[in-house]
Amino acid sequence: MDKILYHYCNTQKMYGIMSGRQLRMSDITKSNDYNEVYMFFPGIIDAMRDAYYKNPFPFEFDGKTNEIGMSMLFQLAYDYFRIEFDKGGVTNFVICFCEEGDKLSQWRGYADNGRGVSIGFSEQELRQYSEKYKDIIAIEKVKYKTAEEINDIIVAKADSLLNELKNLRKWIIDNFHCSDSKQEKYMLLFFIQMLKIVFMKSLQYKNISFQEENEWRMFFKYPITKETEFIYGEDGDKRVIFDEMVEMLKDKIDFNILDNDIVSYFPLDLSDISAKPIKEVISGPNNRILLKDFQLLCGKYKYDDVAFRYSKISYRE
């Protein structure tokens, strides 16, 4: 039997979803869950450093060898990410769902303190959508882990990255046939991109204290670039990797305007999910939408067979 996954939001966003016929995959660093994109930083660099000291292998970077060369590469990567995180340059576009459509913690945290709604979508249809873009977009059930388990994940990913570093220079020489100075540039560039990919893996995890949320996330498999020339420009010569994803984002990024911020997002067309994507809307415990008004809204924007019901939770602000 198909499962319904619920997206909690305020009433204004519900109207935007229905009238614009699109969901918004928004910059996660501007959300309640902004810490998750930093989950593996700087821990993974520290773990790689510790692992290399314990089991060193021949390594060269920028004229320096072994431990000194590796330390130099780690420091450059650390400095890059410290600055980029501060500037909002390392992020992902995410939309969150919950397995339960009438849950107090979700009303409080994600639906305007119960004044909003939850919108039900088919898990199967969301999976089919992500399959159409399987090299770019994923939908995953969040895995809830203890701090110790998250640390073990970081250590395992650090070991994996170190193994990739062993052969990175040879791979660059074989594929780019470039000068020595370009080799160093590519070494740092690809190491940073390798770390970015690993940082995006953190979106699959949350601390076990949030386990009751039963959350699912749809997100991009690779980090979002906020480079203007990639998203809005004509020059693609600088592209090295993630080209297919950059092409999908090109000229599509838009902005949600808050009183004190702008939040970039990727619009996900509901028609690309299903002919009848919205299965149900649940009115929150402090929401005042009446059935007839909701039916008029559905009629105006040509939504058929959308179930509507009220929260059964007794909750007042």
Tell where the protein language model's regions lie, with residue ranges.
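Partner-binding and oligomerization surfaces adjacent to conserved cores of proteins
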Residues: 1-317
